[in-house]
């Protein structure tokens, strides 16, 4: 009995323990099935409800215990898998919870892991005959448990959809009754959460040719080894065979270790980098080897790896399309071959591949990588409200959205997802179409654009209106007697109800500006005038309008006085009066036309005669040696901005010539004499266009393209010679052409030359000019060429002349020289001095390591020291002081508009590349591109440019120098915010951290709001000179 009781008690205790274990082993969180993109990480969560016992967790994969490593590890009770691999990690995962006290174990339900990947796509031909063409898009990839693969078909880059004889059936493309309009290259794209790929090869269909290239239909049959080269061979009637000339393979030890892998998905605006690790053997380092990056088969960036210096302008594949455009966002690192993007934009999406090219050998290609850009969801453009004309047959409201993936566009009315009204539909492009517009179509319509990023909306108001029309228009002319009464009718219909406004001689009439006792405005729009006066005579206009538009009708009121004998019975003579008035008017008009034509012919004859006399006189004075520069040229007849050229040089006239010209001067205005003077100045600057060579476009400015090229050294005149020639001509004009004045001319030339120097350093100025003369003994001079393309834009022409006069009037080593002006034909070229190191901003970025400028056998330049920065700022101050002393203003002073040479000589220049290269540094304000972050407040508010505003910009330039030009001034603010704060006087400036203490106060004074309190360039130069001396100590 006792034993039986003991067994019963043991059974009860076991049941109780089992119940406790069952309750304690229930899971609070169980692992969930997941689908993840390959190479991404995943986490399985597992947690038991038993918080009183010590538990141990294990994980099983497909029934086997997991061996943990760095990639697959357990944190607490959760399982973490880094860089998921589809070949190893796919399957079921089970969490095992073990009670260490009792040894009881509990298993969670299995969780399935599916891997999403996308490798490649190819087009396969399933069948082709006259009645049907059947293609299949074969994809190597999987979408897991998410949405299936999305397949898109393209013909010659045009996206196809089910239409007419084209049918899309899952992965297949069916074209029934194919014809010549279906000819082209067919390719397909596949996309899922892992990205998007396009078939590397396509299928070419051509209905009119019997020999068609065919894709292989067996998987083991090889395509071309190079994915970016496709050659289809077709033997013609003559039996000729096409082929490619093979190049020898590169050495095996020259190879690419790692290229861009798989597919990268980057959000718009984020930075990224593409890897290209390579091995370069020592025996090949002295040979020509190029590292290239290609995008969609086109050359994007390249760099020389070998020791041999590259030939300028030469490339191994110069005949191929290239995308070698200057873009500060893209940097190719020579050391490791990485292609880095500072910020991604939508156009960067594509297929990238790096390549090693040994001269005269076949290229070595890496595996291609796909860069997909997630474009921000936005409307392009924003939908706007619209007025629709009642009973219009068709009216459209557009709604276009962009984003990644492609957004779906739909319309709803009044914020509710209800059915649109009758005769309103939405086409495939998201356009809202109204047919047979009626009043029921009024309301608020919302456009919804949706993709995986979310949803955006824009609401527009649709109003149905009726264009105003005259139901009773004013009819005239109206004649009335003085002190009579006249009624001018004007009634209108429309929806909304039109308003009616009267005016007299284009001046609005209302009860406030008229005599209320005589003028009466009726509710229906009629104007009644009582007790008509003589001054009431004139042209009266009635304007009707509503939100749909405006219309106007005029009526003439004629007031007859009592003395004119106006009476109703005399109206029969009105016909004769009208006829006489018409005859008189026509006679006067004909006489005026004859007079104008006669004056035009006379002026043209006088101008040609005067031009002939000037040409003859110039030829005689030059001894017959001067060629006809532009007198007979076609280009000079069509110069819209600059004064026309004249033959030879303007010199002194003899007394008889002056008497012959005296009569012409009486017919010429002061403006024509000024035009002759400017023409003489431009003629001195004339350069033949044939002297320019190797022009390379580096950007676009406000009035045209900007180039860098070379100028024959024989055409470069030293500044001293130019000044002496000019001074000699002025002396001859004043003192006559006799030889006795040569001594005084030379003396005055030297004195004028010394006076033209700035007061900072005359001795260094003379040395600089002597060095320039010595340098001109070479064959060619590096120059900057600015083209005047906008010849019909008066503002652009005026700015072109201003820059020309500015650089012509200054001879200083701190300002670039003006070599000349090419005016033989359009466009005109302004030829300026340029340096071997280019613009200062790019130099600063290179020394800061932001731009890769390393060439073969060299390294990146080191950052500038404080002494070097002060030397650069001092030279710019000297150049700006020279501009100030010549009574000019620069208006666009910045590091981008200065140049630096390999001798560390800095000069103030004027490239002004505001349209592409430095477009971020300009903002369109009042219909003009302005460097608002460098402008003083008075320039933005009142368009007032002075030397003090140049000093304001100079302070910003020094700020750029100490920051190595790595960031924009106030880059945390938008352009609109900078303009608003500058106009409000709330834009705060502070000097750079590396600025010496001795310069902080004077630099801060450059930015004070009162221009009179800003320092001068001479004061800034003196402060910089002291700072340089202190830095040297």
From Swiss-Prot:
Disulfide bonds, which pairs?
46-95, 137-188, 276-354, 399-447, 490-542
Name of the protein in its database record: Tyrosine-protein kinase-like otk
Gene symbol here is otk
Q: Which residues form a coiled coil?
A: none
Q: Which PANTHER family is this protein grouped with?
A: TYROSINE-PROTEIN KINASE RECEPTOR, TYROSINE-PROTEIN KINASE RYK
Matching entries from SUPFAM superfamilies are given as: Immunoglobulin (SSF48726), Protein kinase-like (PK-like) (SSF56112)
Q: Which InterPro entries match?
A: Ig-like_dom (IPR007110), Ig-like_dom_sf (IPR036179), Ig-like_fold (IPR013783), Ig_I-set (IPR013098), Ig_sub (IPR003599), Ig_sub2 (IPR003598), Kinase-like_dom_sf (IPR011009), Prot_kinase_dom (IPR000719)
**Gene3D superfamilies with a match to the protein in the record:** Immunoglobulins, Transferase(Phosphotransferase) domain 1
Keyword Signal appears in the UniProt entry: yes
Q: One GO CC annotation, please?
A: axon
Compositional bias annotation for Basic and acidic residues = 720-731
Extracellular compartment residues: 23-581
Q: How does it assemble?
A: Interacts with plexA; component of a receptor complex that mediates the repulsive signaling in response to Semaphorin ligands.
Biological process, per Gene Ontology: axon guidance; cell adhesion; dendrite self-avoidance; homophilic cell adhesion via plasma membrane adhesion molecules; imaginal disc-derived female genitalia morphogenesis; imaginal disc-derived male genitalia morphogenesis; internal genitalia morphogenesis; negative regulation of canonical Wnt signaling pathway
* Residues with the Phosphoserine modification: 678
* UniProt-annotated stretches for the region Disordered: 617-679, 718-760
Where the record annotates domain Protein kinase, the positions are 692-1028
Membrane topology, Cytoplasmic segments: 603-1033
User: What range does the record give for the signal peptide?
Assistant: 1-22
Q: Keywords in UniProt for this one?
A: Cell adhesion, Cell membrane, Disulfide bond, Glycoprotein, Immunoglobulin domain, Membrane, Neurogenesis, Phosphoprotein, Receptor, Repeat, Signal, Transmembrane, Transmembrane helix
Q: Where are the transmembrane segments?
A: 582-602
Q: Which residues are glycosylated?
A: 39, 336, 417, 429, 444, 457, 512, 524
Q: Where is the composition biased (Polar residues)?
A: 655-673
């Amino acid at each position: 009995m006792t034993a039986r009781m003991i067994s019963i008690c043991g059974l009860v205790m076991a049941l109780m323990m089992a119940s406790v274990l069952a309750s304690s082993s229930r899971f609070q969180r169980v692992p969930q099935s997941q689908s993840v993109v390959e190479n991404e990480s995943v986490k399985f969560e597992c947690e038991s409800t038993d918080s009183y016992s010590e538990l141990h967790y294990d994980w099983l994969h497909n029934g086997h215990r997991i061996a943990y490593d760095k990639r697959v590890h357990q944190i607490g009770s959760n399982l973490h898998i880094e860089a998921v691999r589809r070949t190893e990690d796919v399957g079921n995962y089970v969490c095992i919870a073990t009670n260490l006290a009792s040894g009881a174990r509990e298993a969670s339900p299995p969780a399935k892991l599916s891997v999403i990947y996308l490798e490649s796509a190819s087009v396969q031909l399933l069948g082709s005959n006259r009645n049907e063409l059947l293609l299949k898009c074969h994809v190597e990839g999987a979408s897991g448990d998410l949405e299936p693969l999305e397949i898109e078909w393209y013909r010659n880059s045009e996206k196809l959809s089910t239409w007419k004889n084209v049918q899309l059936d899952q992965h297949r493309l069916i074209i029934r009754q194919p014809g010549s309009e279906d000819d082209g290259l067919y390719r397909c794209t596949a996309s899922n959460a892992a990205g998007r790929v396009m078939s590397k090869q396509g299928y070419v269909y051509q209905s009119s040719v019997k020999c068609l290239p065919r894709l292989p239909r067996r998987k083991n049959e090889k395509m071309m080894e190079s994915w970016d080269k496709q050659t289809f061979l077709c033997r013609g009637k003559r039996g000729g065979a096409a082929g490619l000339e093979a190049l020898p393979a590169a050495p095996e030890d020259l190879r690419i270790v790692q290229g861009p892998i798989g597919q990268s998905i980057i959000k718009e605006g984020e930075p990224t980098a593409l890897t290209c690790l390579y091995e370069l053997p020592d025996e090949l380092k002295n040979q020509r080897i190029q590292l290239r990056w290609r995008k969609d088969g086109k050359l994007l960036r390249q760099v020389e790896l070998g020791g041999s210096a590259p030939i300028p302008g030469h490339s191994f594949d110069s005949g191929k399309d290239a995308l070698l455009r200057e873009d500060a966002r893209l940097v190719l690192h020579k050391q490791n071959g990485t292609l880095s993007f500072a910020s991604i934009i939508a156009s960067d999406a594509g297929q990238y591949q790096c390549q090693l090219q040994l001269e005269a050998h076949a290229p070595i290609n890496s595996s291609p990588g796909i860069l997909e850009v997630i474009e921000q969801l936005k409307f392009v453009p924003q939908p706007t409200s619209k007025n629709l004309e009642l009973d219009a047959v068709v009216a459209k409201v557009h709604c276009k959205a962009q984003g990644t993936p492609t957004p779906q566009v739909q319309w709803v009315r009044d914020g509710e997802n209800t059915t649109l009204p009758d005769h309103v539909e939405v086409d495939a492009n998201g356009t809202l179409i109204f047919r047979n517009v009626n009043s029921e179509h009024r309301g608020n319509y919302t456009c919804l654009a949706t993709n995986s990023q979310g949803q955006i909306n824009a609401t527009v108001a649709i109003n149905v209106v009726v264009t105003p029309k005259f139901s009773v228009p004013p009819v005239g002319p109206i004649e009335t007697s003085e002190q009579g009464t006249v009624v001018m009718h004007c009634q209108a219909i429309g929806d909304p109800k039109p308003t009616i406004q009267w005016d007299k001689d284009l001046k609005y009439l209302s009860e406030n500006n008229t005599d209320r006792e005589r003028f009466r405005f009726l509710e229906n729009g009629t104007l009644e005038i009582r007790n008509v006066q003589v001054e009431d005579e004139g042209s009266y206009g009635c304007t009707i309008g509503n939100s749909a538009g405006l219309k106007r009708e005029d009526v003439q009121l004629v007031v007859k006085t009592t003395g004119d004998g106006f009476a109703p019975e005399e109206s029969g003579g009105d016909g004769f009066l009208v006829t006489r008035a018409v005859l008189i008017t026509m006679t006067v008009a004909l006489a005026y036309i004859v007079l104008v034509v006669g004056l035009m012919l006379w002026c043209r004859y006088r101008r040609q005669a005067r031009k002939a006399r000037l040409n003859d006189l110039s030829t005689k004075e030059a001894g017959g040696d001067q060629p006809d520069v532009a007198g007979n040229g076609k280009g000079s007849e069509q110069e819209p901005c600059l004064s026309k050229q004249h033959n030879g040089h303007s010199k002194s006239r003899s007394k008889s010539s002056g008497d012959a010209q005296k009569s012409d001067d009486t017919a010429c205005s002061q403006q024509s004499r000024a035009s002759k003077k400017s023409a003489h100045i431009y003629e001195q600057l004339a350069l033949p266009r044939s002297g320019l060579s190797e022009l390379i476009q580096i950007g676009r400015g406000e009035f045209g393209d900007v180039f860098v090229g070379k100028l024959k050294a024989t055409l470069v005149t030293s500044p001293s010679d130019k000044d002496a020639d000019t001074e000699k001509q002025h002396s001859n004009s004043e003192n006559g052409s006799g030889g006795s004045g040569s001594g005084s001319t030379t003396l005055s030339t030297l004195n004028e030359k010394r006076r033209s120097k700035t007061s900072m350093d005359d001795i260094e100025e003379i040395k600089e000019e002597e060095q320039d003369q010595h340098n001109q003994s070479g064959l060619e001079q590096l120059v900057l060429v600015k083209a005047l393309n906008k010849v019909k834009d008066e503002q652009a022409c005026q700015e072109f002349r201003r820059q020309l006069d500015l650089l012509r009037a200054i001879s200083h080593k701190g300002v670039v020289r003006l070599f000349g002006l090419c005016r033989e034909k359009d466009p005109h070229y302004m030829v300026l001095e340029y340096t071997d190191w280019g613009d200062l901003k790019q130099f600063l970025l290179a020394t800061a390591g932001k731009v890769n400028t390393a060439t073969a056998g060299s390294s990146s330049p080191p950052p500038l020291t404080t002494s070097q920065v002060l030397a650069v700022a001092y030279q710019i101050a000297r150049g700006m002081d020279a501009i100030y002393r010549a009574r000019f203003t620069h208006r666009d002073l910045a590091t981008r508009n200065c140049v630096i040479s390999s001798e560390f000589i800095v000069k103030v220049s004027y490239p002004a590349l505001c349209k592409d290269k430095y477009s971020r540094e300009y903002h369109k304000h009042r219909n003009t591109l302005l460097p608002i972050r460098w402008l003083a407040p008075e320039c933005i508010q009142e368009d007032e440019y002075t030397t003090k505003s140049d000093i304001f910009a100079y302070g910003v330039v020094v700020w750029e120098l100490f920051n190595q030009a790595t960031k924009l001034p106030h880059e945390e603010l938008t352009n609109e915010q900078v303009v608003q704060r500058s106009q409000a006087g709330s834009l705060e400036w502070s000097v750079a951290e590396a600025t010496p203490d001795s310069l902080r106060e004077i630099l801060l004074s450059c930015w004070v709001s009162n221009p009179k309190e800003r320092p001068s360039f001479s004061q800034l130069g003196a402060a910089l000179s002291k700072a340089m001396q202190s830095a040297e100590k």
